[in-house]
């Protein structure tokens, strides 16, 4: 099936999102719980419903608990000025990290957060003392779920995979679709329905980056 737009790869697993990517735009609008460490003048009206304690001068008082979209929280966060502090969403806290370490495959990641890996990677932008544990948990969760995802993509050809895919985060869904497309392309080639097997986009992009590095 052809796509209605040229897909732009997400940059959320790196230091910054790629705002040409629809996935990253959606992820950056997910809410993050924060606490104001200083009064925020002239913003009380904007956060009035979320912050019932807004003062009459339209300032958000110090100590207010808000839920801000990720992009705004990143923009306001400053280690030196301490404008706000970030509270970890429950899915990234120690209790859930313990669940992931026991068996990451039992968790419905899409229900907990459709951009689990990308959003978690962006949390490392903030100076949480749990950053090292979060990054390790993200890595081990991905490793623990990767084999099952790819095995299913290769062994569920022409079968109903909606129940499996419904539990995957958006990045995992992309991997699953890539696996199924690779299998489909191989079977078409095996039946003589394709003239050649082409390299995947991941391999092609890696070669381009490597060639660019050599030129530099």
UniProtKB/Swiss-Prot annotation:
Belongs to the GINS3/PSF3 family. It comes from Homo sapiens. Required for correct functioning of the GINS complex, a complex that plays an essential role in the initiation of DNA replication, and progression of DNA replication forks. GINS complex is a core component of CDC45-MCM-GINS (CMG) helicase, the molecular machine that unwinds template DNA during replication, and around which the replisome is built. Pfam families: PSF3_N (PF22466), Sld5 (PF05916). The gene is GINS3. Residues 1-16 are annotated as: Not essential for folding and stability of GINS complex, but may regulate accessibility to the central complex pore. This is DNA replication complex GINS protein PSF3. Component of the GINS complex which is a heterotetramer of GINS1, GINS2, GINS3 and GINS4. Forms a stable subcomplex with GINS2. GINS complex interacts with DNA primase in vitro. Component of the CMG helicase complex, a hexameric ring of related MCM2-7 subunits stabilized by CDC45 and the tetrameric GINS complex. It comes from the Eukaryota. It is found in: Nucleus; Chromosome. GO terms for cellular component: CMG complex; GINS complex; nucleoplasm; nucleus. Its main location: nucleus. Keywords: Chromosome, DNA replication, Nucleus. GO terms for biological process: cellular senescence; mitotic DNA replication initiation; multicellular organism growth.
């Amino acid at each position: 099936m052809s796509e209605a737009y040229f897909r732009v790869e997400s940059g959320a697993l790196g230091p910054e999102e790629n705002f040409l990517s629809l996935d990253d735009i959606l992820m950056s609008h997910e809410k993050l719980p924060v606490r104001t460490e200083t009064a925020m003048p002239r913003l009380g009206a904007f956060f009035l419903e979320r912050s019932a304690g807004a003062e009459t001068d339209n300032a958000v008082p110090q100590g207010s608990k808000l839920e801000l979209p990720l992009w705004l929280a990143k923009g306001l966060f400053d280690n030196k000025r301490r404008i706000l502090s970030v509270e970890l969403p429950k899915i990234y806290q120690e209790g859930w990290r313990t669940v992931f370490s026991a068996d990451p495959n039992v968790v419905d990641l899409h229900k907990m957060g459709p951009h689990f890996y990308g959003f978690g990677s962006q949390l490392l932008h903030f100076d949480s003392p749990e950053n090292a544990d979060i990054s390790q948990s993200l890595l081990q969760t991905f490793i623990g779920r990767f084999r099952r995802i790819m095995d299913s993509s290769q062994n569920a050809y022409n079968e109903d995979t909606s129940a499996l895919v419904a539990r995957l985060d958006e990045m995992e869904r992309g991997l699953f679709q890539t696996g199924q497309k690779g299998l489909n392309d191989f079977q078409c080639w095996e039946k003589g329905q394709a003239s050649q097997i082409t390299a995947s986009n991941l391999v092609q992009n890696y070669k381009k980056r490597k060639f660019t590095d050599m030129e530099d």
